[in-house]
């Protein structure tokens, strides 16, 4: 995993590494800090074992509910929290609620917990954003906000169908049939290449196939 506070488009170390790394799954995040300090420990993605987690958005009123959220993290996981970002706390809440066993359920319970604690403190819309998490084999992505106005999230259409529509596009000949991209905003200007994920939904990309399902936060189970 490579993390840096340097701008990705001007990071020579990243450029050098990218030319020598190959993988069946890449996880990348370029962000502008909102409220948290600009430091490497706050850079996405966050990792626990083989799990990676990143988030585009924010927990509204995080300073007011941070203590409530942090003390809900399982005591065996708590020492791993190194930074001050709301995303890292959300990640460890999801781990506490069973991310390694059932990612959709754990994320639903983590966000449900954030919303419950936020509303108890008078915060109308506690959560905003999109989430991506992976175990290195499969990818889970979520689009949800308390207000129902989430950050955008797009995924690519089937590569084989795109090849038939655009037989002269060299880039489509260079990728495999099972290639998928999930991004915050469309990359490039190829008409029909991108599909926007619906509001309040989650997707799964795995060897068994792709799924797109509704997402609803849940009341969390007891954490201890």
Language-model region placement:
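Conserved short alpha-helical segments that host acidic/polar catalytic motifs at enzyme active sites
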Residues: 1-55, 59-224
């Amino acid at each position: 995993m490579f993390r840096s506070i340097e701008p990705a488009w001007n990071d020579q170390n990243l450029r050098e590494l990218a030319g020598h790394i190959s993988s069946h799954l890449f996880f990348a995040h370029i962000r502008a800090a909102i409220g948290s300090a600009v430091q490497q420990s706050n850079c996405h993605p966050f990792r626990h074992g083989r799990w990676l987690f990143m988030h585009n958005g924010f927990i509204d009123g995080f300073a007011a509910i941070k203590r409530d959220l942090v003390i809900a993290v399982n005591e065996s996981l708590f020492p791993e929290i190194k930074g001050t970002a709301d995303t890292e706390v959300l990640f460890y809440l999801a781990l506490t609620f069973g991310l390694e066993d059932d990612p959709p359920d754990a994320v639903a319970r983590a966000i449900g917990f954030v919303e419950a604690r936020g509303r108890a403190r008078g915060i109308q819309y506690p959560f905003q954003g999109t989430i991506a998490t992976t175990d290195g084999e499969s990818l889970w992505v979520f689009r949800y906000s308390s207000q129902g106005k989430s950050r955008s999230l797009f995924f690519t259409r089937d590569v084989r169908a795109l090849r038939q529509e655009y037989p002269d596009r060299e880039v489509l000949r260079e990728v495999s049939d099972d290639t998928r991209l999930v991004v915050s905003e469309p990359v490039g200007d190829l008409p029909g290449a991108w599909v926007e994920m619906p509001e309040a939904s989650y997707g799964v990309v795995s060897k068994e196939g792709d799924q797109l399902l509704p997402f609803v936060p849940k009341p969390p189970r007891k954490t201890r």
